[in-house]
């Protein structure tokens, strides 16, 4: 051995921080909290006073026979300004779940990406996926970590949708879970829900259109109609923008196909049908 040769060269593992070599849980979030706590969402110091940051707006979820879906508008606002017209607010987080985000956009995006890694990390280490309740609880725990930011006005409100592969009845296996800013989680048993600034109008629309026995195409149409109604009354929610070719984002989750993003071409067809229909009947 050369006297100039370091031990880290001969034993590369010794160059790793202790956190990488210490046995722990199968939670990637727990590992990150020890190895690099500054990377955790909500761990950074919160500035005093109001902070102007882009906010995502309206997300809807509804169940149908054999699954569940998420749909969201594409607008992000900052105060009274439109910060972005084509923001993506829906994310597939594993084979049978997806999350829509409303609230402070930057923190929400960081949180949902870490959440997707958390689910993948658990599955790789344990060899099985988390149960649907386990997935929902993981997101609640992460949301609790942002409480300081939420109290300073940087709140995040995710909406979780998943297909319960262990359900007795696959036709009723779609699940929706909502959260509050403190990390409280709530199973939405009514079959539909909405979060964000236009949620009041979207839920009112879904109350009239929701059908638990609908097929996936009918449910998708109902979701886009609800987003249109929200945009009609809420300035922070963006409706279908045909001139800019910006359409709602939609993710469907079923037992056969898993979590699948509806192609933009199909979303464009549905949005165009809704807009044309409202020309004849503005109230829907």
Swiss-Prot record:
Pfam families: Proteasome. The keyword DNA repair does not apply. InterPro entries: Ntn_hydrolases_N, Proteasome_sua/b, Proteasome_suB-type, PSB_actinobac. GO terms for cellular component: cytoplasm; proteasome core complex, beta-subunit complex. Residues 1-56 form a propeptide. GO terms for biological process: modification-dependent protein catabolic process; proteasomal protein catabolic process. The active site is at residue 57. The keyword Cytoplasm applies. Keywords: Autocatalytic cleavage, Cytoplasm, Hydrolase, Protease, Proteasome, Threonine protease, Zymogen. SUPFAM superfamilies: N-terminal nucleophile aminohydrolases (Ntn hydrolases). The 20S proteasome core is composed of 14 alpha and 14 beta subunits that assemble into four stacked heptameric rings, resulting in a barrel-shaped structure. The two inner rings, each composed of seven catalytic beta subunits, are sandwiched by two outer rings, each composed of seven alpha subunits. The catalytic chamber with the active sites is on the inside of the barrel. Has a gated structure, the ends of the cylinder being occluded by the N-termini of the alpha-subunits. Is capped by the proteasome-associated ATPase, ARC. Belongs to the peptidase T1B family. Component of the proteasome core, a large protease complex with broad specificity involved in protein degradation. This is Proteasome subunit beta. The lineage of its organism: Bacteria, Bacillati, Actinomycetota, Actinomycetes, Pseudonocardiales. The gene is prcB.
